[in-house]
């Protein structure tokens, strides 16, 4: 049942209404670098985001913030000169494709010409369980929701009892 529980938690991570936290994190952007891996063991070493959402921004050494717009695959593909350098990038593209390492990629455009700090807001995968006895802390209401939905999920594997006709 542990695998069923973790599978359910994994699928819940894709639903905004079930994601109880949008986490803001910051990462160092290096001058002249526009591509960064993100995920456990990546350049941005954090739990791999399920989704990155607005608002995102960069902060310079003077603590001035500049917004960054999220763009999709199509918009990123239309950028002809991806290595153009300016002080502040204007766009962020999150490539969620899975590599063999399980990492995703963040592209910032234009490539910054100075070191900056990137702030992103992301959905994180709901915690999985290492064992049935694993204790996790959840917001109010989640324990019952998990118990109920796991029962519903597991019930499909059992045959229903047919009442006998007298």
Q: What does each model-found stretch correspond to?
A:
Residues 1-166:
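Glycine-enriched, solvent-exposed interface loops adjoining structured elements
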């Amino acid at each position: 049942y542990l695998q069923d529980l973790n599978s359910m938690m994994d699928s819940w991570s894709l639903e905004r209404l079930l994601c109880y936290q949008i986490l803001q994190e910051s990462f160092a952007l290096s001058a002249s670098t526009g591509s960064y891996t993100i995920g456990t063991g990546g350049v941005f070493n954090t739990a791999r985001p399920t989704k990155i959402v607005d608002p995102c921004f960069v902060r310079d050494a003077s603590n001035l913030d500049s917004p960054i717009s999220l763009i999709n695959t199509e918009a990123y593909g239309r950028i002809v000169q991806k290595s153009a350098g300016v002080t502040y990038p204007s766009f962020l593209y999150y490539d969620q494709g899975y590599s063999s390492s399980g990492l995703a990629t963040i592209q910032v455009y234009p490539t910054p010409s100075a070191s900056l700090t990137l702030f992103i807001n992301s959905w994180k995968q709901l915690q999985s369980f290492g064992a049935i006895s694993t204790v996790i802390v959840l917001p109010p209401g989640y324990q019952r929701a998990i118990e109920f939905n796991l029962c519903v999920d597991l019930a499909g594997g059992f045959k229903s009892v047919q009442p006998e006709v007298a």
